[in-house]
Amino acid sequence: MADKRIRSDSSAAAVQAMKNAAVDTIDPPSHAGLEKKAEPFWHDNIRSKALDSWTPADLLAAVELANNQLYITVLRKDLRKEERIRGEERDEGLIKDLRKQIVELQRTILAQRRDLQIHSHATNGESRDQKKRNQNDRDARNTKNEHQDQDDNLIAFPKHG
């Protein structure tokens, strides 16, 4: 049976949010095949919701999402390069194909984001609870960032997740 969820307005949720802020992100599963250049997309996606909300299956899907986000930037770069060509060297068939691939990949990315619930009711419960958990996470990160460089800082921050 699944563990009972912590109330988003509890002190335990605030403590978990501070732990999440100290860790900042989650490393991708080594067996999932995240492209090196897709790491910025990975970290942005992972930070989109509370770190303790990610399941192992979500992390695998997040790798696919990050790789697709990288791939769409490559396709857009190729499209811009082809669109700059003038005259007989311009390949309209390739341009049309690239545009089609971009649209299809955008749809895939949107579906993956919905599935991951960078809004998922199935993994994270009611959306009102997820909204509060995400707010707790943002508040904890802001507090950490405001106070971490102060020499006379009296706020205790966890050093390890």
From Swiss-Prot:
Give residues annotated as binding DNA.
K96, K100, R107, R114, R128
- Keyword annotations: Coiled coil, DNA-binding, Viral genome packaging, Viral release from host cell
Coiled-coil regions listed in the entry: 88-115
List all disulphide bridges recorded for this chain: none
Helix-turn-helix (HTH): annotated span: 37-60
Q: Quaternary structure?
A: Homononamer; forms a ring-like structure through which genomic DNA is translocated into the capsid. Interacts with the terminase small subunit; the active complex is composed of a pentamer ring of terminase large subunits and a nonamer ring of terminase small subunits. Binds a specific sequence on the viral genome. DNA transits through the central tunnel formed by the small subunit and sequence-specific recognition for packaging initiation and termination takes place as it emerges.
The similarity comment for this entry is:
Belongs to the Hendrixvirinae small terminase family.
Q: What is known of its domains?
A: Contains a helix-turn-helix (HTH) doamin that is involved in viral DNA binding.
Function recorded in the entry = The terminase small subunit binds to the packaging initiation site and regulates the ATPase activity of the terminase large subunit. The terminase lies at a unique vertex of the procapsid and is composed of two subunits, a small terminase subunit involved in viral DNA recognition (packaging sequence), and a large terminase subunit possessing endonucleolytic and ATPase activities. Both terminase subunits heterooligomerize and are docked on the portal protein to form the packaging machine. Packaging initiates by TerS recognizing the packaging sequence in the viral DNA.
**Name of the molecule in the record:** Terminase, small subunit
Source species, please? Enterobacteria phage HK97 (Bacteriophage HK97)
Query: Lineage in the entry?
Result: Viruses, Duplodnaviria, Heunggongvirae, Uroviricota, Caudoviricetes
